[in-house]
Design a protein with these regions (language model features):
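Amphipathic helix-loop-helix modules that constitute alpha-helical solenoid scaffolds
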Residues: 1-35, 45-64, 151-238, 350-364, ...
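Residue at a conserved register position within TPR or TPR-like alpha-solenoid repeats
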Residues: 20, 24-27, 62, 69, ...
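Short coil/turn linkers that connect adjacent helices within long alpha-helical scaffolds
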Residues: 40, 47-52, 72, 91-97, ...
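Generic long, charged, amphipathic alpha-helical segments
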Residues: 57, 488-568
Length: 609
């Protein structure tokens, strides 16, 4: 009978537990036996068979099994053990003095397991119980930590930031409410002085961070990178500097490495010192590996390849790393940065000229995965990328990117923009406006593109978003300069010339990524100046560079613009040839929304023959 089977399971479990207590740590398969023993006990309990006098021991064993499973990144099994452990505690007295620590540990583990397993409602239930019964701030910190991650994942950045800064105040860390360039530069200067004699070896030989409050302060600061990058990126350098300063004073932990990475990012974004920023990014990677932060490595690789490596390494390399990092993050239970990695992979794959039909399938699958993982915040950016792809490959209006995302609350792009604006997600709003601008540019709607460029103005300096804003705005300006009267042409020429200057800085950082873009901007500049020989040479150089570095979409653009130039100097046959080659490249890219424009241009030439 079921009861007899349950009794058998129970007796087997008790015998193994008794054997474990006798053999202590001498048995080589002790870990496996522990899991088997507690599995037997849990099976028996599901049939109502247990021994109340041993409940505390069973709860402790389940806690041990759950924590061991989660250390091996098996969060589903871990949560099952934790739930069983809680079920063994007496309902009326589980929070009394004798079982308080055990009950608290089980609820702390349950919070984390629920978050990783995409069970936010369940996580909030455990968080509420823990906060209601915890006796001091230190006993509430793990609950607050998971609460902040839950809020971040759901996109409620306002509450996530408020709770984080409230906790940091209780931990003795305060920050200015208004950030000025002077404050940022002062903090970076102070941190630079602190790091003058820094070596990786000196950190590894330094004491570990033992002060629990300072350790938790750094942990909470490390949680801020996501929300601040969307709502208040100017705050990022201050957080990074504080993490470095606390680590230098009190000792180092795995999270300290992210302070060094943030410091490196600030060298790029504030001082435009790419070499120094890249150097600190590499140090941060190496430091985390040496400090043993295995679970944090995917997050570190994601941030490094999304914000730092693009200035020195080919996009084709970093996009592949991000795809691999997505899988790594899933394996260690970092569902937030699994989603962040996937988002940045999609974005970087696009600028590599990934086929847009393949990109559509990948983007849709990743958006669905984000919903499944309850990483709703990342859906803003992912859906925005998805819309861009659909507009470029001609499927916009045929495919609905919104049905399963945001629980049906968002039905179109305008509602997505309004939600981003109303919730204070400035970078998400900028991203939507920026993609609209770039679509108008690629579709040759230059007057509309110029208007949208103004709305999408002022993205973060030395950022991925800034680079492609400057590129498209510069080319748009040169197009409009040639179409305008002399009075307004000077305005457009100024914008175009500023883009050329900016791209000379970018190209010095990475010839692979941005040489072809610079050559195309220079070609358009020379055409506006009626310097035909120089323009032709730069067009050819742009086409060659795009071919060599495998940017098929930018090769197509350079071919088309070269064809336009040849047409203006009445080199009709060669112009037709370039248009034909451009069409082939656009087809390879999958940009079917652009191809009718090339067909029209080719038809116009044929009509004059």
């Amino acid at each position: 009978s079921p009861k007899e089977r349950a009794e058998c399971h129970f007796q087997n479990g008790v015998k193994m537990i008794t054997a474990l207590s006798c053999c202590a740590d001498s048995h080589s398969d002790l870990g496996l036996i522990t899991f088997v023993a507690i599995d037997q006990i849990n099976i028996a309990k599901s049939f109502g068979v247990t021994d109340s006098s041993m409940c505390t021991q069973f709860a402790k064993l389940n806690l041990k099994a759950g924590e061991s499973s989660m250390e091996k990144f098996n969060f589903m099994s871990g949560f099952s053990y934790i739930e069983h452990g809680i079920s063994f505690l007496p309902k009326e007295s589980k929070w009394n003095s004798s079982s308080y620590d055990l009950c608290r540990s089980l609820h702390e583990a349950a919070c984390l397991a629920c978050y990783v397993n995409a069970l936010p409602t369940k996580a909030n239930e455990y968080i509420s119980v823990l906060l209601e019964n915890a006796q001091c701030l230190e006993h509430k910190l793990k609950a607050y930590y998971v609460m902040v991650k839950n809020l971040t994942s759901s996109g409620d950045f306002k509450q996530a930031l408020k709770k984080t800064f409230d906790v940091l105040i209780e931990l003795g860390e305060t920050f200015p409410t208004e950030i000025t360039p002077e404050i940022i530069q002062e903090e970076l200067s102070n941190t630079k002085s602190l790091l003058n004699n820094f070596t990786k070896e000196s950190i590894l030989s330094s004491p570990k961070l033992m002060d629990e409050k300072k350790l938790w302060a750094i942990k909470f600061m490390n949680n801020l990178s996501g929300p601040l990058s969307i709502t208040n990126y100017q705050m990022g350098p201050l957080i990074a500097c504080r993490m470095v300063q606390l680590s230098s004073k009190y000792g180092y932990c795995s999270e300290s490495a992210f302070g060094f990475l943030g410091y490196g990012q600030a060298q790029i974004s504030v001082f435009e010192d790419v070499d120094e920023g890249y150097r600190w990014g590499k140090i941060a990677l190496s430091l985390l590996e040496s400090l043993g932060g295995k679970g944090y490595l995917p997050k570190m690789r994601c941030l490094f390849n999304s914000y730092v490596s693009l200035w020195k390494e080919p996009f084709h390399a970093s996009s592949n790393v991000l795809l691999h990092t997505h899988s790594e993050a899933m394996l260690v239970g970092d569902v937030e940065y699994a989603s962040v990695s996937a988002f940045f992979y999609c974005r970087q794959a696009l600028v590599c000229g990934q086929n847009l039909l393949l990109a559509e399938k990948e983007c849709k699958a990743i958006a669905s995965k984000m919903v499944q993982l309850k990483q709703i915040q990342m859906c803003y950016g992912q859906v925005n990328t998805y819309i861009f792809i659909l507009k470029m490959n001609g499927n916009y209006g045929k495919v609905n990117p919104f049905p399963e995302i945001f629980d049906g609350k968002i039905a179109n792009e305008e509602e997505l923009l309004n939600l981003a604006l109303s919730s204070g997600k400035r970078i998400n709003a900028k991203g939507i406006l920026s993609n609209r601008f770039q679509v108008a540019f690629w579709l040759g709607q230059f007057e509309e593109a110029a208007e949208l460029a103004e709305k999408a103005k002022h993205p973060p300096k030395m950022s991925f978003m800034e680079v492609y804003h400057v590129f498209c705005e510069g080319l748009t300006a040169f197009q409009l300069a040639r179409r305008s009267s002399s009075s307004s042409a000077s305005k457009w020429m100024t914008i175009g010339e500023e883009a050329v200057t900016r791209f000379r800085l970018y190209e010095k950082c990475s010839t692979w990524n941005w040489e072809n873009n610079l050559f195309l901007l220079e070609a358009e500049y020379h055409q506006c100046k009626q310097e035909e020989d120089k323009a032709a040479a730069k067009y050819r150089a742009s086409i060659k560079s795009a071919q060599e570095h495998r940017f098929v979409h930018e090769e197509a653009l350079a071919l088309e613009f070269y064809g336009d130039f040849l047409r203006t100097i009445r080199s009709v046959d060669e112009s037709k040839e370039k248009y034909g080659n451009a069409r082939l490249c656009y087809e390879k890219w999958g940009a079917h929304a652009i191809i009718p424009r090339l067909e029209e241009k080719i038809g116009q030439i044929q009509g004059t023959e």
